Amino acid sequence: TASAGNHGLSLATGAKIFGAKSIVYVSKNVPNKFIAQLKSLGSKVSIVGNTYDESLKAAVDDSKKNNWILISDSTWEYYDTGLDVMEGYLISISQALQKIKKNPTHIFLQAGVGGLAASFAAYCRKKLGYSPIIIIVEPSFAPCLQHSILKGEPTLVQGPASNMGRLDCKYPSRQAFYSLSRTANAFVSITDKESLKGTLFLSKRGINISQSSSAGFVALKKLIKRGDFLLDSETRALCIFSEGDVR
């Protein structure tokens, strides 16, 4: 598989449990902490390219050439194994909703290729209906879902690498895009500078997470200042912190 971190750890863990071999392709921008964790789980790590998309292409090409089984967290035409990965994400959102006493009025979901966001949004629509406003958050350097919505089809975007490494994806998951086009209310982007500022804000309050993880919260703060999306004193916002500090 190719991964910017978390999916690779999951796959490496599963392979170890079942006695299988795993190879995880990562870009040069993936934190060394992730690479060390992958190796500790027995996975071989191949560092290819500067972005997730470049490492994914290498994983796809080598899988075809070597007749390997590819387990990607993304989907594209004629490949939908990523749907199984998306189904696994449902455990997290179901646990989150169980702990909430009152239903959220707003849900902020960070997105890379969109798999996690799409599965969470679909689950929330099923359980909560269309009352919560669901907002998808992407890096300003990689707003592939936002651009895809504007184009009406999965669309490649160009841009420099973002510090929000797990969200730095230039092309969306096909299935995630079409799902979010029906379940999400809005797509917003945040800059790396805004991301860093928001992450430091949380750190000073004892919440130590990565810039990728804090994206939903950062967008919430940004939109409150702008007075958008009916955010007021009665708002009950749900943000998902999807990983800890990876430095």
Spans of model-derived segments:
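Glycine-rich beta-alpha junction loops
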Residues: T75-Y78, A111-G115, E138-P143, N163, ...
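Short, acidic/small-residue loops that bind anionic groups at enzyme active sites
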Residues: G19-F34, K127-F141
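A short, small-residue-rich loop immediately preceding and capping a beta-strand
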Residues: T1-V26, P104-L116, A237-F241
